Amino acid sequence: MTKLLEVEGLARNFGGLKAVSDLTFGVTEGEIFGIIGPNGAGKSTAVNLISGVTRPSAGRIRFAGSDVTGQPPHVLARKGLTRTFQSTTVYRNQTVRENCRRGAYLSLYPGFLPALFTTARAKAMRAACEDRVSEILEWLDLARVAELAASSLPYGAQKTLGMAISLMAWPRLLMLDEPVAGLSAAEADHVRDTIRRVRDRGISLVVIDHNMRFMANLCERILVVHHGQELAHGTPQEVLTHPAVIEAYLGRKYVRA
């Protein structure tokens, strides 16, 4: 399988603190790849490095065959790499549909002058945007609430809306940071089904979370991070039975249980 994302020797230091140290992994086309670890393990820092929010202290990141190390988020989004954040990033006073339109900016915005004047190209771009909004809302089961204010949605649906905004740019790779944090088990199951539908549309995913049950039932491969370093890497079954993972999550006394 073709490697879509390649991370080699990734590191980030904050003063004397090594938040991420020598992470190396790859994500193939069409894969749901997981990164898990206890709170404070360095998962979100790794995502920030890959998505361009934070510059790495060392290492290399390649996406779709090109070196993208240190490139800013808007450049990566245009190349097909987008992400969500732990907290919901929706405009609460805008409708679900209006929120989705925001996500089309990078891929469909015609430029300042075409947008200012009513050109044929600008009209075509706006029409394409509306078509895409309707498609994404239908796809993620948000069409029935499209005209409601985002603030009126349950928290789980707001998380799905954040995913919809990121999908408006039709990324090749979508990174989801803590997609089920704060959700009930039923809401988490719904998010898992939504992620699978996204993958079925040909979009690869990197999912970052500390919910072991959720991740084991979703991802093909999982990287376990602890203190900013790789602790284990493999299939869900391999990492769930790894002694170092058991010790990190449950304590040393459970390793031989």
Q: What are the functions of these language-model segments?
A:
Residues 2-257:
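Glycine-rich phosphate-binding loops of nucleotide-dependent enzymes
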